[in-house]
Regions:
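Short Gly/Thr/Asp-enriched flexible loops that form oxyanion-binding sites at enzyme active sites
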Residues: 132, 185-194, 331-335
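Proline-aspartate-enriched helix->loop->beta-strand connector
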Residues: 167-181, 197
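Conserved beta-alpha
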Residues: 85-162, 166, 170
Length: 387
């Protein structure tokens, strides 16, 4: 895939920001089909499945957060995230659990002449080997072509070129990492450019579920949002994590989600204004005015794709903005991501107090360089990002 194709694919995604992270608006079936297609076409896909704990942790860990933004496909693997989305009018259709997607791939892909090749990296000692045995006898069109248990080594030790070489030699289609969410995402970010495996994902629970060392909750419990109780019953060590997440969720609701909903309701009463944008070549500034909401973003996406491909955009001026939604915020996150990949940085200017508050409620105000009232002496040049 060319750089131009990668930019276009990323910015055309239907993504919405929830708790500071951009989520693809997709279903479990669509995700399954997308991953199978990527594996068969050998197209790179970094697949990430944040749950509530993931989202809360990401708010205080920029490296962890960026691993989600840098992903190619992001799904909401937790009912609390779906509840938050519905509260804010964000159309995430359903929870998409990574372990459920893996099972769908096992059950729905039927081509024994071209099996999907999987390699496991991580997990408790012996668990990956047991998962290998289970998959080997289930007569599915999937085969495990390697499993590695790096133990508790350092990131450098787990990223040794010899380990990467061994993984690449498996000729796998899917790499499942199980190192704990933060370490797993960090390891993927550090090594994915050197890995030849097209689809890579941290799915820590999958190895345990396949091996049978941990039982998955019944479907009705998963859909009710009470899977955390089942997980505590199965793994008592998770109690502290869920206790922390529960407290953080209540605080988020009181200080971010409820005020965000109230603000969105007030904005919904404003008259609708068409989205307009223009580009100033002399300052490489894109000016946006009107309603930056999902239904109006198609032409803007096309313009942004062209500007990023040509490395012309350095500033987005939001002075004339009337209202915005989670789709526009997510688009800005992807725009900044692609500009950073090109070695440059993005600045947002003239964001008024209402929209700045909306950025705060959406947990993204610290993700952007925002200049409220730029003066002629402000440096808004397209400067290289700091590594």
């Amino acid at each position: 895939m060319t750089r131009e194709e990668a930019i276009a694919r990323d910015l055309k995604r239907n993504v919405w920001t929830v708790m500071g992270l951009p989520f693809d608006c997709t279903t479990e079936q669509e995700t399954t089909d997308h991953l199978i297609d990527a594996m068969l076409k050998e197209e790179r896909c970094f697949f990430t499945t944040p749950n509530l704990n993931f989202a809360i942790t990401a708010q205080n860990d920029s490296q962890f957060r960026d691993s989600v933004i840098n992903s190619d496909w992001v799904v909401a693997d937790g009912m609390p995230l779906i509840w938050i989305a519905k509260t804010l009018g964000i159309p995430l259709p359903e929870r998409v659990a990574g372990s459920s997607v893996f099972e769908r791939v096992r059950q729905e892909y039927k081509n024994p002449d071209r099996p999907i090749r999987v390699v496991f990296f991580g997990g408790p000692d012996g668990t990956a080997a047991e998962a290998f045995k289970k998959i080997a006898v289930d007569n599915s069109s999937m085969e495990v072509v390697g499993f590695y248990s790096p133990g508790f080594g350092s990131m450098d030790e787990m990223s040794d070129p010899e380990i990467i070489k061994q993984i690449n030699q498996t000729d796998a289609d899917l790499l499942i990492v199980a190192l704990g969410a933060k370490r797993g995402q960090q390891w993927i970010e550090l090594n994915r450019k050197q890995l030849d495996v097209p689809v890579i994902s941290h799915l820590g629970a999958v190895i345990n579920f396949v091996a049978g060392t941990v039982k998955r909750a019944p479907v009705w419990i998963q859909r009710s949002g009470l899977e955390w109780l089942w997980r505590i019953w199965e793994e008592s060590s998770l109690f502290k994590r869920y206790w922390h997440d529960g407290r953080a969720f209540i605080w988020q609701y009181l200080t971010k989600i409820r005020p965000y909903k109230n603000l969105m309701q007030k904005q919904s009463q404003l008259p609708q204004i068409p989205l307009e944008f223009s580009f100033l070549n002399d300052s490489n500034t894109l000016q946006i005015s009107g309603d930056a909401v999902h239904r109006n973003l198609s032409d803007l996406r096309s313009a942004l794709i062209e500007l990023i491909e040509e490395e012309r955009i350095k500033v987005i001026d939001l002075k004339g903005l009337s209202r915005l939604d989670g789709s526009f915020i997510a688009l800005l996150q992807l725009v900044q991501k692609q500009i950073n990949i090109s070695g440059h940085s993005l600045k947002l200017i003239n964001l008024d107090s209402v929209h700045l508050q909306q950025f705060e409620y959406a947990c993204v105000s610290d993700q952007f360089t925002i200049i409220q009232h730029p003066s002629p002496v402000d440096d808004v040049s397209l400067a290289p990002t700091q590594s």
